[in-house]
């Protein structure tokens, strides 16, 4: 056989090999057909109506509606097509109906349905459309804004239901599938994989989200996320996007969280969560060095609320929480949802680092208050006594009134910031310094003494109160 013939023969064999690989790879892809056929009947479309003031502005004789209440796909269309004008004053006397669209799924034959809180929030009427196109009015049993879970009930019997799975067993890289009503297109199916678990999102402290690359769009909210066994492992809730559409970052509420919330809503119409009564922050590399940790990990306690569970259990400012009941705290965001999942009254074991030493505290978890916002502010005028130091700040003693308002025994208030380390780390007049280099500050004189003894070329921590919120910051003093 000639050389050209050998080359052609080898090329043909290689092509056959590639085709075989492609066929084998295709054969390994999951077939979602049985799953979709079995699960779809239990997935529902949810539409809501809400009466809102009708604000209408004039646009050259053309009546331009207020677009805020329209479903997202219609609102985006009109925003592109009709320029919005300022609302006409006094136009709120009349009312109109605002509508929204979402998804949900049936969890019991007698009509209990799970969806997102943001799908049904403030609705005057909730309509559930089943897979056979029949519609039922739903009653809102309860909502939980902190987890974005809502429980509905329709009056019906022998409804199709989903199979509930254990989201704790979900693995990163596992195939998952969503069924919902994106932009109102009922029972649309999309698939992808689990990208990560235990994700924390801004202002969503109590849910360890499942991150996927499943295509999720407006209208998918509240719909189920299935594993390959046809079990619901999450409720599709949010996407991260810069364009308003899907960008490969979707987030679902784990069913372990959703069902705990649903059970409480069904039993009492409200949700109780565990609460420590602390303000925490992330431990970065510099803070880890400052507090003598081997690596950045845990939740740094920046503030302990007076008479709260943590205070009663002996937790102190500057403690670093490493684990709760044996579960490691890798990032500070891990702590809130672990504590929140505990029943109030539970005695939890907290492993902490305090002044370089490890110890375990037993803390009785309290009940999260309805409003866990900031408790103290600092707006009183500082006293006239001053003390300057090598950090580039002038400080003053706190008055007794300030200490009482801020629940402090010591500390100093910044009067002036000059050029130097303080300016570089963003300190401002009015900030209150309570700790420096892991030492509590008792007076302006004490602050100056501690500042003068600070080490050079090593991370140093400082605890600062600004408008009632405490945090640790770090800096280094050069030679």
Swiss-Prot record:
It catalyses: Acts on substrates that are at least partially unfolded. The cleavage site P1 residue is normally between a pair of hydrophobic residues, such as Val-|-Val. Its main location: periplasm. Residues 368-390 are annotated as: Disordered. GO terms for cellular component: periplasmic space. Keywords: Hydrolase, Periplasm, Protease, Repeat, Serine protease, Signal, Stress response. Pfam families: PDZ_2, Trypsin_2. One of its GO terms (biological process) is proteolysis. The active site is at 118 (charge relay system), 148 (charge relay system), 221 (charge relay system). SMART domains: PDZ (SM00228). It is found in: Periplasm. Residues 1-27 form the signal peptide. SUPFAM superfamilies: PDZ domain-like (SSF50156), Trypsin-like serine proteases (SSF50494). GO terms for molecular function: serine-type endopeptidase activity. Substrate binds at residues 219-221, 276-280. Residues 265-356, 362-468 form the PDZ domain. PANTHER family: PERIPLASMIC SERINE ENDOPROTEASE DEGP-LIKE-RELATED, SERINE PROTEASE FAMILY S1C HTRA-RELATED. NCBIfam families: degP_htrA_DO. Might be efficient in the degradation of transiently denatured and unfolded proteins which accumulate in the periplasm following stress conditions. Belongs to the peptidase S1C family. This is Probable periplasmic serine endoprotease DegP-like. It comes from Pseudomonas fulva (strain 12-X).
